[in-house]
From Swiss-Prot:
Chain positions found as N6-lipoyllysine: 63
Cross-referenced InterPro entries: 2-oxoA_DH_lipoyl-BS, Biotin_lipoyl, GCV_H, GCV_H/Fam206, GCV_H_sub, Single_hybrid_motif
Subunit structure: The glycine cleavage system is composed of four proteins: P, T, L and H.
Family under the similarity heading: Belongs to the GcvH family.
Every Lipoyl-binding domain range: 22-104
Note on how the cofactor is bound: Binds 1 lipoyl cofactor covalently.
An example Gene Ontology CC term for this record: glycine cleavage complex
Cofactor: (R)-lipoate
Protein name per Swiss-Prot or TrEMBL: Probable glycine cleavage system H protein
């Protein structure tokens, strides 16, 4: 199966993505497929400080409970509150309405992330 891996995003080996232009973070299409139907998402609060690769939340599916990791260090500037009542958005639109948080971050942190080609190779 082929998964969508947008070229304009950066990725973690743990399957989170970040949009370098906006700081928006989510999980990849591959990750949501592996998880199965998402039934609950726990996220940080606006204003919380995150360190790169530290836990930023939890996603619970019918198959598993998985930790979510911060692709960069920074301050949470927005949280996708829609996921409280519609966690299935993570499955339906992992790169769209299923985003998790937005982070104000230092672009130097992107050096420790994967580009789309490297991420595609990881999930192949």
């Amino acid at each position: 199966m082929s998964f969508d891996v947008p070229d304009d995003l950066q990725y973690l080996e743990s399957h989170e993505w970040i949009d370098p232009a906006t700081g928006r973070v989510g999980i990849s299409e591959f990750a949501q497929d592996e998880l199965g139907d998402v039934v609950f998402v726990e996220l940080p609060s606006v204003g919380d400080a995150l360190d790169q690769h530290d836990e930023l939340g939890v996603v619970e599916s019918i198959k598993a409970v998985s930790d979510l990791y911060a692709p960069v260090s920074g301050e949470v500037t927005a949280v996708n509150d829609a996921l409280t009542n519609e966690p299935e958005l993570v499955n339906e639109a992992p790169f769209g309405d299923g985003w998790l948080v937005e982070i104000d971050f230092d672009s130097d942190d992107l050096e420790a992330t994967l580009d789309s080609d490297d991420y595609r190779a990881q999930i192949a």
